[in-house]
Each structure stands twice: as structure tokens, then as C-alpha cells.
Amino acid sequence: RLTVQDTNMGMNQSLIFAEGCENICICGGGELDGQGTRTNFPGDETCHGTPGRPFLMRIIDCRDVHVHDITLRSAACWMENYLNCDRVLLERVTVRNQTNYNNDGIDIDGCRDVIIRNCDVESGDDACCFKGASERNTERVLIENCRLYSCCNALKVGTDTQGDFRDVLVRNCQIGGVEHDPSGLKHRCSDSGVSLEMVDGGTLENFLIENITIDRA
């Protein structure tokens, strides 16, 4: 299997970056704007081909991360990436990320004890995505009372799936496709409401989705 270093080369440029930290709080009110429409950011389709295109937020190997009551807008690439973290809490976060290819909303990668609650996400790519770029498992995740809308997949596992995924509960959420893509890049509302793409050797266990509404997918 690949390592985190193999799969994340050139992706550490971000407006907010933390590695090996504890007790992080990013809270509002207020707004963080990644200015992803700026012409100085490369515009090719894939992140791997454009290492100069930053995330808005990338948090690696951190503990006790709390993001709440804030709006995150217009990243050049992914909006929020949490990699190999423990005890992550996202509450009342609004994400509007539809300016470029690869405009994911929330990416959870090898994290444990995660709560995503009362968040509102509209993204050009995956709205909320579970990834496994290393062999560290993603475990004990709760997503509830969220609105997740996307031009691609509203709720997704993969495609980086070297690690395993277990004990995930998604409930009381509204998910689907955005009404239109303001970037004009994809010319569609959505690929799917829920997409489970285990392609790299990881396993999916005890992944429960209940009481959700899907439209425009």
C-alpha cells in the first residue's frame, strides 16, 4: 500500500496549515476567502498536476480540533482537509467552494472520533469525502443535521482507500446536487448523492446512512 507521502506530494500549501498541534480552534463569526478565482493559481483539472494550487485549510496529525460558526469560501483547491487527526469537531460551518476543479468541501482522511454537525456545504467537487491516503483507519465518525450539495458527489468514500473505514454514522441530512455550477466547469448538477468507491485495498465496515433526503443527484 502507498503512504501518505506517496499520495500527498505537493499538497501542503494552504492558507491555514497545522501539523502535530493540539487544541486548535478556528471559530467565527466571520469568513475565510481563499480567493480561488485569482488568475495566479494554476487551473488544470487535477491537484497532482498543479502543486501550486493551495487548499484553504490543511490539518495534519493534530488532536482536539474545533471549527465552528464560520464561513469558508472559494478555495483554489480543496477547502478543508483533516489528515490523521483525532477528535475533530465541525459545527455550524458554511462552505461555498465552486470556483475550480477539485473544489471539495470537507475531506476526512485517516481521522478518528470526528463529529460534523449542522454544517452547510456547497462544492464544485465532493461535498463531504472520506479518504484513506495511508493505512491509518478512519473510525468513529458522526455526520448529522447537515446540508451537503455538490456538482460531483455529495457524500463519498474514496477514491484514496488504502486505509479502512469503520463505525461511521450519517443521519438526518439533506444531500444532492447544486442547482447550478457558478464556475461553469462541469455543466451538470451532480454525479451522485452517495458514492462508495473502495478501490485501493481498504475495507468498509459498519457504515450506516439513515434518514437522509437526496435530490438533484
What is each model feature region?
Residues 1-217:
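Extracellular/periplasmic carbohydrate-active domains that bind, remodel
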